[in-house]
A protein has these predicted regions:
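Histidine/acidic residue-rich metal-binding segments in metalloenzymes
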Residues: 113-133, 139-205, 211-232, 242-256, ...
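Divalent-metal coordination cores built from histidine and acidic residues
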Residues: 53-158, 224
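Divalent metal-coordination and catalytic microenvironments
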Residues: 10, 28, 39, 60, ...
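Histidine-rich, glycine-flanked metal-binding segment
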Residues: 1-33
């Protein structure tokens, strides 16, 4: 569809025929919503948030959902506060899931220990979306008081709980779903993906630097279940970002496998936004944030330009805005 996209005050004002104070002709190219990584640990990129943004925004990523459990395992709540402050005023919107398991295991001596009371105050922050991957599945099943309190308070705040339950039994998965876990990014087989979707969960199809699961999960995508699937990286090393890109790499792989390009883009945009309750983004529609990516075509998805809140922030692989 050829059309004008009108932008005002950082949002999409209309789609149709418009005249503007400034106009940009992108005829023959494709405009997609800004890409969204639904689960990532920024610390795994070995970069501070500012440099991470510099790396991924030129690849079309305009928002991420991050779990800062790596820095929090060492610094405690100071780590969360640092990450919240360090991600202000960037050309990428950084949303947070609060670390659920600090330390990661009872025997871990990384330096910090957070119970429900320590993290509860952060739910008032507008960029905190919920509780990050609940790794303590044994504690959940056993009814550990702190685990259940964290989950109950997350749900009471109207937030999302991410799961982390690889290779668990169906009955254990039932417990996870019944207690409010809404996502899982640890699926490595089509069977695991289908089991979670059948229980109402969203499945995050992961293609990162440490875990590369996408090729194993793409065969399980169907027109009926694609709306419950979204993309994530979990972790992304700088060399992989430079060589393959960020979430656009997931989109590209899906299309090359044979997934409809529109469906692949939707998994990188609207599906992720809806999963985490981001009603202001994820589509090219009036009232949505003007986070947009200009790509050469719907095959190779070479990113030509990226807009964040209506501002052109990256072009031809480089940042236009100083950080």
């Amino acid at each position: 569809m050829c059309s004008h996209i009108a932008i005002a005050c950082g949002k999409i004002a209309g789609i149709g025929k418009y005249d503007g104070e400034k106009e940009l002709d992108v005829s023959g190219r494709i405009v997609c919503p800004g890409f969204l990584d639904a689960h990532i640990h920024i610390e795994s990129s070995l970069s501070v948030p500012r440099e991470f943004a510099r790396a991924v925004v030129p690849h079309g990523t305009t928002a991420i959902v991050t779990d800062p459990h790596e820095i929090t395992n060492v610094m405690g709540t100071d780590g969360i506060e640092y990450m919240l402050e360090a991600t202000e005023r960037l050309p990428i919107d950084v949303f947070f899931m609060l670390p659920s398991c600090v330390p990661s295991t009872p025997l871990d001596e990384a330096g910090a220990e957070l119970d429900w009371f320590a993290i509860d105050r952060f739910y008032a922050h507008p960029r905190v979306l919920g509780l990050a991957e609940m790794m303590n599945v044994p504690g959940l099943v056993a009814g550990d008081d702190d685990v259940l309190e964290k989950m109950a308070r997350t749900l009471a705040a109207g937030k999302v709980i991410d799961g982390h339950s690889p290779m668990v039994s169906r009955s254990t998965l039932d417990v996870c779903a019944a207690l409010g876990i809404g996502t899982d990014h640890e699926c490595t087989t089509v069977e695991e993906m289908e089991e979670r979707i059948a229980r109402g969960m969203y499945v995050l199809l992961r293609e990162g630097s440490a875990s590369r699961d996408l090729q194993h999960l793409l065969p399980g995508l169907t027109p009926e279940n694609q709306r419950r699937c979204l993309f994530c990286t979990d972790d992304r090393q700088p060399s992989d970002i430079l060589e393959r890109g960020h979430i656009v790499n997931n989109v590209r792989m899906a299309v090359r496998f044979g997934i409809d390009p529109v469906s692949a883009v939707r998994m990188a945009t609207l599906n992720a936004a809806e999963c985490y309750g981001m009603r202001d983004r994820g589509g090219i529609a009036p009232g949505r944030r003007a986070d947009m990516v200009l790509v050469e075509d719907l095959k190779d998805f070479r990113v030509l330009a990226c807009w964040a809140g209506g501002e052109l922030v990256a072009k031809n692989g480089g940042m236009l805005r100083s950080l």
